[in-house]
Amino acid sequence: MAQPNVQSTSEPILSENDLIAQRHAKLKQIQDKAKETGKSVWPNTFKREHYAADLQEQFKDIDKAQIEGSDKTYVKVAGRVMLNRGSFMVIQDMTGRIQLYVDRKGLPADTLETIKSLDLGDIIAAEGYIGRSGKGDLYVHLEGFELLTKSLRPLPDKFHGLTDTEAKYRKRYLDLIVNEETRKTFEIRAQVVAGIRAFLTNQRFMEVETPMMHVIPGGASAQPFVTHHNALDMELYLRIAPELYLKRLVVGGFERVFEINRNFRNEGVSTRHNPEFTMIEFYQAYADYKDLMQLTENMLEKLALDILGTTDVPYGDEVYSFKGPFKKISMFDAILEHNPDFTPENVNDREFLAKFTQDVLKEQVKPGFGLGKLQTIVFEETVETKLRQPTFITEYPAETSPLARRNDDNPHITDRFEFFIGGRELANGFSELNDPIDQAERFQAQVAEKDAGDDEAMHYDADFIEALEYGLPPTAGQGIGIDRLVMIFANAPSIRDVLLFPHMRRKDV
């Protein structure tokens, strides 16, 4: 049935404060009556037995004549009043909406008066039997009714609704009440997380939980949030990645592990970045980065089919194909492909790339930047946004991949990939560096970069080096940004659209 707008024709055009005052007056009347009857103003004894969407599905193929010609089907529903026209109402629960038919001849006068006084947003319980209108709409013929929660603030209506984007983010609860599209987005998010968890569990991965506060920030190149532990009198860092702890677990014998949890990076906010975000990280012993590319293809294709029913996923004006295999190309070749004036010699020439970075890209080149760092900058600035269809970029420079295993044929690159869709990085994975001596040297190089002014360079983690010295089996690991993946599946333009409560600048009180 067509879903009515959140709109009332019975309420006069009053200010919000006037409407709130009216509702408080109604609550006072309810409280006064409750004192006489001994009933609770906020009852909590009703037990719902049916959901709106389940009833719509159950009776979708049963016409009016069949419903009226058979034994009555009695139901008990509950939800928020979204429309009240006197003779019928519409309530909304977590699954959808259903009409309630108000039989003026069959209900007591005081019940009819209470129904008439209901405001949009009130939460009610209803009992009755199923019927179908002449227009074909399914309804519950009301026989019993109870007000469960009195709403003291008016809902946005059709013309003055919750259209301000910032208001949607600040008052997500209200956005969820009035916008079906918003509810659908977060249902998709839940399906994505559940689908990933089920896929990996079926592959014999074990879900684990690792610390959210770290003594040393590690596992990624980013600025951390800093806090203080009063009892231990020491600085701690909100984690930027769980990687080093998860690899410790592989050392300990848990050969397939994953964690779905929050990471925190004290960096900028944009349509693609939020300082607090959700990641899935997983590690598999006796596998390499190519195995994880295959796993990623299989998992994303299954998610698309299970959630959307297709591997052709619309996003804005584009359609992304989640049907594997996905394109795979090295960073070196991708730079050449998208910079036709470059030669292979140019891409391997530090001085050429430094001049291009400064003069064309207008990016600062610090003295410590090596060839790999400059290649990465050129790739990020000239290639990334052009990677529209699902694409694996492979063979990242060792200089910018301090935790990845060096390639056997070329020690200047690593067995690493990043995965892109719509010009955005969604995943990062690689064959893990399990040589503790090489890892220690790379940590030392990162410390030198940090001392030279690179705030995102990594710290030296002696405990992790000690763990590697006990022996990490050949392992591959990967992280996928849940928020960005949900953006694609939900066709959401901003990362804030897929976060229930995104961080906002504090308003003046």
UniProtKB/Swiss-Prot annotation:
One GO term (biological process): lysyl-tRNA aminoacylation
Superkingdom of the organism of origin: Bacteria
EC class (word): ligase
UniProt keyword annotation of Metal-binding present: yes
MF term (GO), any: ATP binding
Gene Ontology, cellular component aspect: cytosol
Cofactor: Mg(2+)
Catalytic reaction annotation: tRNA(Lys) + L-lysine + ATP = L-lysyl-tRNA(Lys) + AMP + diphosphate
Free-text remark on how the cofactor is bound: Binds 3 Mg(2+) ions per subunit.
EC number: 6.1.1.6
Entry's localization field: Cytoplasm
Keywords carried by this UniProt record: Aminoacyl-tRNA synthetase, ATP-binding, Cytoplasm, Ligase, Magnesium, Metal-binding, Nucleotide-binding, Protein biosynthesis
Main location: cytoplasm
Binding site for Mg(2+) 1: E418, E425
Binding locations of Mg(2+) 2: E425
One Pfam match: tRNA_anti-codon
InterPro entries assigned: Aa-tRNA-synt_II (IPR004364), aa-tRNA-synth_II (IPR006195), aa-tRNA-synth_II/BPL/LPL (IPR045864), Lys-tRNA-ligase_II (IPR002313), Lys-tRNA-ligase_II_N (IPR044136), Lys-tRNA-synth_II_C (IPR018149), NA-bd_OB-fold (IPR012340), NA-bd_OB_tRNA (IPR004365)
HAMAP family: Lys_tRNA_synth_class2
Family to which this protein belongs: Belongs to the class-II aminoacyl-tRNA synthetase family.
Complex and partners: Homodimer.
Protein's name in the database: Lysine--tRNA ligase
The encoding gene: lysS
